[in-house]
A protein has these predicted regions:
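Small-residue-rich transmembrane alpha-helices
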Residues: 28-40, 74-78, 110-139, 151-177
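Conserved transmembrane alpha-helices of multi-pass membrane proteins
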Residues: 49-62, 66, 138-166
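Conserved phosphate/oxyanion-binding catalytic-loop motifs
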Residues: 87
Length: 195
């Protein structure tokens, strides 16, 4: 039941979900591309001679992961804010808060999985470009090549799952514990234009 209703809700709120999906996809792509750069055998071979390169790649990867956690958290809060009125309506017609929460989690699971998979694909192409940029900086002869890094993918999956899972748990807690009137009031605050 959740999955069918979740897909219908995604179709109905397609404009908002496209923004959300693109944001998550780009976040996953950036995380993967920087991690793939760090796991690249060519870059690792260059890094043996240049400790500063290793430090730079690690710092950039950490910065991208740190910024990604804020972007993912904001994206989830954005979607929750856009949907609070709808969730309040569901509860007013008799749906339990637990069911509403599970519906939101199902919708976000579909979107998050799709965004991660597409982000991994986009990130693979982007990692080839980043690899080329690094080789240009250090004047190393090269050709553009795209290669998939299973290690980078696994670490990206772990980071993405932790950040996305934490954000979804926070959103689920809000849905479960807020009263209907609070959901409606928050929706009014969220959608009303500021003076």
């Amino acid at each position: 039941m959740y999955w069918k209703l979740a897909i219908q809700n995604i179709r109905r709120s397609l404009r908002d979900y496209i923004i959300y999906f693109v944001t998550l996809t780009l976040t996953a792509a950036l995380m993967y591309s920087f991690l793939a750069l760090g796991f690249s055998s060519d870059v690792l071979a260059m890094a043996e001679n240049m400790s500063m390169l290793t430090t730079g790649i690690l710092l950039m990867s950490a910065l991208v992961a740190f910024m990604s956690s804020f972007v993912i958290g904001y994206a989830i809060r954005f979607m929750l804010g856009r949907r609070k009125k709808e969730f309040a309506t569901y509860e007013l017609i008799g749906m339990e808060a637990k069911t509403v929460r599970n519906l939101f989690l199902a919708e976000n699971s579909i979107i998050g999985t799709g965004a991660f998979l597409l982000g991994s694909l986009v990130g693979t192409g982007l990692s080839g470009l980043l690899n080329q940029v690094v080789k240009n900086i250090f004047e190393v002869p090269h050709t553009y090549q795209v290669s998939f890094s299973l290690q980078a993918w696994a670490v990206t999956f772990l980071f993405f799952a932790l950040m996305y899972g934490f954000g979804m748990l926070r959103a689920a807690k809000i849905i479960r514990h807020q009263k209907v009137i609070d959901l409606l009031y928050d929706c009014l605050l969220y959608t009303s234009p500021s003076p």
